[in-house]
């Protein structure tokens, strides 16, 4: 069987996967047949018959050709020859096209060298320089005089039109340039005015062509430090526009209120900038700076309050609250300066002053924290570590609370000692006490290595101490009370330390640390009671002259801690004296006793063992009528019958 090789010369007709759209088919029919008016049934039938006859003719020719049995080698040779001819024709066409392209490119290089060079071949670039070929008209046909005149008139018109257009463009450009110069002059003059007033003007980090003003604090928390840079935009007329970015449009300020027994009795004054015109560029910069500072202040207050929950500090929605005493508390919130601050009918001058002082204090402490950040940044950094360094909370609430609590305890102790010693003076017992508030604050020895302001603030960040020195009635007896408040390191809060010097009761020593007012009051009155009992037993005071010749009774202390003394007369009669001391009064009661009851302790009336006193005397600090002194009363009851 002989091998046959057939090579189809027609392109294969593939079935389309999708039908042509109707508009496409209509376009094809129009391109093939022309207008639909020229197409009728007879024309179409004739065309169909013509196509059928053509197919039959081609099939017959192919059938006859296929019947010829050619040798396989000859067919392959013919195929290779045909392919070589086709390739040669294609290469020749390509070369002719490239020659034509080089010719056109070289011709155009006379007028547009850069554009023409991109389409030239490398060989042509080497052998022919750019612009070496040009074209011109040779023996142009003569033109009539009318055509020449028309050409000159047209060219003159085009030149005049071009000159007018150029003049209009120049005038418009000059006007626009004048406007731009005026705008730029105004813009740069306002920028220089901002710089001359001390503000830092620099380029924006992400916009190299824009200027910005640095009104924030470089040592602030990163989220507020990055917001402290605003762009200085130029308006259409050249005015300066401050693009504040994330800073709110309205001003904000931290408000401090003092609430006493559930009623707001004091409020700080809203902080306002000293600039008269708030709409000026400086006024807007100051407003943005102050608002950013107030937001950072409240942010740090809330951040510090979250770690002070165990010390009575609570936070709410836009509110920080802490108690100073049982009746007094302080509230801090971030509000609009135009909001109503407090009811004037309930305002107390003292609490208003306290609120203003607290508002100034927390702002000063935040500025001090910024300075500490700057000082820390200028020092050598600590060793590198994989652990993330914790940013400590600023000392804003803790020093403020320490001062308020310490002031409250100092005022209470001073008032208590004043009342007790007033009672003693009313009883004729000469004694006094000396108060030294804030003894730990030594302004004379401020650290000189730092600025004065920082050294002054540093004094109030230390634990606060106040001392009270009191003399007792008996000579060489005294006691000291030291009030110490610390909210930075444990133990937190206010503690009282009492030191006692009482030679006649050497075993009596107070606790090392007391934290309650009631305990302090009890200890102080107890020491004074012991000293009064000792004074009576030793007969201190002025002797009382008596007309009768009687021997005064000698008092013996039986229960010193309960203020009880016993006296036995020469005839065997016995008397008991009970001394009671409180903040408001000093009372002395005399009782007649018999037998073994003399050495038993007196108890309250509810016990059923305390008889009615035979004599008694009470002294108060605000007594309207004069009374005999304590020693005079003791001398009068010490007469034996």
Curated annotation (Swiss-Prot):
Stretches that traverse the bilayer: none
Under Pfam families, the record lists: Med17
For this UniProt record, give its keywords in alphabetical order, as a comma-separated list: Activator, Coiled coil, Nucleus, Transcription, Transcription regulation
| Compartment(s) of residence | Nucleus
Tell me which GO cellular component terms the UniProt record holds: core mediator complex; mediator complex
Biological process (GO) annotations held by this record are: regulation of transcription by RNA polymerase II
InterPro entries named among the record's database cross-references: Mediator_Med17
Record GO terms (molecular function): transcription coregulator activity
Tell me which domain of life the UniProt entry assigns to the organism this sequence originates from.
Eukaryota
Q: Which residues form a coiled coil?
A: 159-186
Q: Tell me, how does this one assemble?
A: Component of the Mediator complex.
Task: Please give the family membership noted in the entry.
Answer: Belongs to the Mediator complex subunit 17 family.
Q: What is the recorded function of this protein according to its Swiss-Prot or TrEMBL entry?
A: Component of the Mediator complex, a coactivator involved in the regulated transcription of nearly all RNA polymerase II-dependent genes. Mediator functions as a bridge to convey information from gene-specific regulatory proteins to the basal RNA polymerase II transcription machinery. Mediator is recruited to promoters by direct interactions with regulatory proteins and serves as a scaffold for the assembly of a functional preinitiation complex with RNA polymerase II and the general transcription factors.
Name it: Mediator of RNA polymerase II transcription subunit 17
Which species is the source of this protein? Aspergillus clavatus (strain ATCC 1007 / CBS 513.65 / DSM 816 / NCTC 3887 / NRRL 1 / QM 1276 / 107)
The lineage, from the top, is: Eukaryota, Fungi, Dikarya, Ascomycota, Pezizomycotina
- The gene coding this protein: srb4
